[in-house]
Every structure is written in C-alpha cells, then in structure tokens.
Amino acid sequence: MPSSDIHVSAVVVRNSRGEVLCVRKKGTALFQFPGGKPEFAESSLDAVIREVNEELGISLDAALLVPMGTYRAVAANEVGSDVVADLFYYSDSVQPVAAAEIAECAWVNPSVPNVKLAPLLKDEVFPELIANPVRSVAVFTGASSGRNHTNAILAEALGAGLAEQGVRMIYGGGKVGLMGAAADACLANGGCVIGVIPQNLVDGEIAHAGLSHLEIVDTMYQRKQRMSDLVDAYVCLPGGAGTLDEFFDAWTAQQLGLHRKPIALFGSSFWAPTVSMLKHMADEGFIRQDDVDTLIVADTVDELLVALNSWAAPCPKWN
C-alpha cells in the first residue's frame, strides 16, 4: 500500500492534431501532464493556471478550462506513493516554452506515444482519451430558425444532448434562431456554452448574454479560427450561407491535413441535397470519395457522439 498521496493539479492540453502536451521534469525520465502541487489554500484551478504559467509560459484562460475529474495512479517519481490528480481539459492553440523545473516538452499522440509516460497518463487518462476523444464541439448553424419547425427541435436536442454527455458547446455567440435554441437547451441542461462572435455582428445577431463565456473578435475569419482552436469536432445543424461557409472551411482544412477533427451533418433530411451534391462532385472527379465518406450524417445525439468518438481521419489530399 502507498504510504502517502501526492495531490496535484494538472491539465490535458490538446492541439488541432489531437496530440496532448506532455512535459518531463529535470532529473526524471517519464513524461507527465503540465501542472503541480497546489499551494496552501490554493484551489485546483488556480494552481494549474499558476504552475503552467511558471513552467511553460502559457497563460491559461480559466473560462476555457473544463474539469475532467480526479484520477489516481502510482506516482512516477516518488516510490511508495500514489499521485491524486485534479485534471482539467484545455483545447486551444498554445506555444509552450520549457522553464523552471521543466527539461523538455513534447506533443504526444495518445494512441501512439513516442515518449515514456508516467502511469497516470499511460494507465488512466490516455485510454480514456482514446475511447472518448471528443470533449468540445463547434456547432455551426443559422441565426434564423428557418420555416421547418423540426429545425428547432434538432437544435434543442443537440444542445441538451451535449450537456447531458458533458461535451462543451462552442458556437457563434448569438441568442436568436437555431444558434440561440441550441445554446439555450445546452445551458438549461447544465452544459458549458462558449460563444465567439465578431464585433459587427453583436447587434445584428444579438449576442447571448447568458453564456458560460463570450469572446468578441474582429472578423468572421477570426471567429472561424478561434472556434476551430477550441474544439475537437464540428457539428453542422441546418443553416444558410454562413453555415455552409463554416462547414466548407472546416472540411477543406480537414482534407488538406490541417486538422484531424471529425465533421458531422446533423439532420439527415435537411442535409440530403448537400450530400447529393458532394457525391456528384466526387463522381465528376473534383472531390475524393474518401473525403465524402468520412463526413458523419446523424439524426440523434447518441448516434452522433458514437460516430464522432470512433471516427478515423482520412489521409491528407496531398500527402
């Protein structure tokens, strides 16, 4: 039996390729998550923000840290002890610089680790990430509700389902139309909703005032880029030109290998004409059939999440 427990706060930072940021401390051989021991009376959240800033020069945004729970494993460097870690999930673009106790940083694919891992990572957390890699999704949809009432039902079902499964929702930040319907349903069921909206659309789309967090950016391009930085997957609800723009932007980037994140079309009847057009383009030789086949089409949240979590990235077009 371990003689003592070592309590730490740590963070799982994930990049657009699905890799996880790991660090090796000076004088040790195994890689672990960034973080460390809380100081007296310091919360787990404050501790991980402080430690990551001191050791890697990264300023974590507290609003974007998602609690994962508490994990226990054999300590990597202290014989006869267990490490008890309060973990947070952070999906964002970061540039770590090793400092203080850190000797080395590495971005690690949980499925094919290229470094030696501490037991907490190898035995507990990475298997969970492999089984359920999707923790945050971008929801693309319209700022209007459309003419078909089933659109709102789809949006509400998606928002509620994401909340019930503990999946964070990132969307365009509006409170009207299907955007608002999905966000309200997620919030009403205890979910975390982050909005990203350009300044010039704050008044036009009426920014949602009740979100978990709202970011205001300068341009539509920055909105798409920011949403992409924060998520593990993309889900498209019914929408118009803006929704199509967001979908094709994410899909093109996927084809080029700029990210390895699944894309889903939620509501098969609405998206049937789009899928038909894409198949026609594939038949004409303008799109690879493999890229069309990797798109997920779903009608229920359970079906959607199973498909997102079991998805395999296609080979990049120009690889």
Model-derived features: positions:
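The catalytic Nudix box helix
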Residues: F33-M68
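NUDIX/MutT-family hydrolases
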Residues: D86-S91, V97-A131, T300
